[in-house]
A protein has these predicted regions:
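Glycine-rich beta-to-alpha transition loops that act as phosphate-gripper elements at the mouths
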Residues: 10-16, 76-89
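Conserved active-site-proximal phosphate/metal-binding subdomains
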Residues: 29, 37-77, 85, 95-270
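Generic hydrophobic/aromatic pocket-lining and core-packing "Φ" positions
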Residues: 18-22, 68, 90-91
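Conserved alpha/beta-domain cores
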Residues: 1-47, 54-58
Length: 270
């Protein structure tokens, strides 16, 4: 049977990008995820020259706010992501013309998520106790994009002192060598290897191996012969207060709890 074309939902951080995709793309765009800088994982960099605050995190300003009214004029559905994990945020998104919200952080820490159960429990405990904080690290990711790191006071996680080895390579980028061949390099691989492939040594500073860390998050850390297992590195959106609000005095919660929490102000009880 003929395959059904999947919907193409583009992730954007500006109305200008959305309009360009909708009008000039050589294929159909079915909608947009509008991701703000409060979202977990990778973030779009701030518009303009990169500026850092006193903690070393990128500074976002008015230019980074998406013009949702202009986006709505395209007539395509859109979902708001980044700081949208609350009943109030869902209600506000719908009022602004959004089809809904995209939520990551609340589901990441629910019982059904793939994060290692012990790591998840420890993280929730620190979030509830107020010893966790989210840092937007402009250097951690080899992609060059800012990456949200959930810093935990009592949980050992990967840092940039890790002995470098690149044996998964999911974030490698292609480059053309002097001989015309295509090769692959990663700014988090051993520095001498990266430089030998024509990379700028400045690009290696502060990088972490997200590939190994994120696999370790799932409880499947690599352990090479004679070495300790790879350490995890959790990511989270900025809004830890909503996680605290949902978990309350419990030690965990389900995906169903998340859905009911998010829809509390918009769906009448059965």
């Amino acid at each position: 049977p003929a395959l059904r074309r999947p919907a193409f939902i583009a992730i954007v951080s500006s109305a200008t990008l959305a309009m360009t995709l909708a009008r000039k793309s050589n294929g159909r765009v079915d909608g947009f995820i509008v991701e703000g800088p409060r979202a977990g994982g990778h973030n779009a960099p701030p518009r303009g020259a990169m500026q850092l605050d006193d903690t070393g995190a990128p500074v976002y300003g008015e230019r980074d706010n998406v013009d949702l009214a202009k986006l709505a004029e395209l007539g395509l559905p859109f979902w708001i992501a980044g700081g949208s994990g609350s009943p109030e945020a869902v209600e506000a998104a719908l009022a602004l013309g959004a089809a809904g919200v995209q939520v990551g952080t609340l589901f990441a820490f629910c019982d059904e998520s793939g994060i290692d159960a012990k790591l998840k429990y420890d993280a929730l405990l620190e979030i509830a106790n107020g010893t966790a904080r989210v840092f937007t690290d402009p250097r951690a990711s080899a992609t060059g994009y800012p990456f949200k790191v959930l810093e935990l006071e009592h949980t050992v996680q990967q840092n940039d002192s890790r002995e470098r080895i690149c044996d998964l390579g999911y974030l490698r980028t292609a480059y053309k060598g002097e001989d015309g061949r295509i090769g692959y390099r990663c700014a988090a691989e051993p520095v001498e290897q990266y430089v030998a492939k024509g990379g700028d040594i400045a690009d290696t500073v502060g990088r972490r191996c997200l590939c190994n860390a994120l696999v370790a998050n799932t409880g499947h850390a690599q352990q090479r012969e004679g070495e300790a297992p790879e350490l995890p590195l959790l990511t989270s959106g900025d809004d830890l207060e909503t996680v605290r609000r949902l978990v309350g005095a419990r030690t965990g919660y389900t995906a169903q709890d998340v859905v009911e929490f998010l829809l509390a102000n918009t769906v009448a009880p059965a």
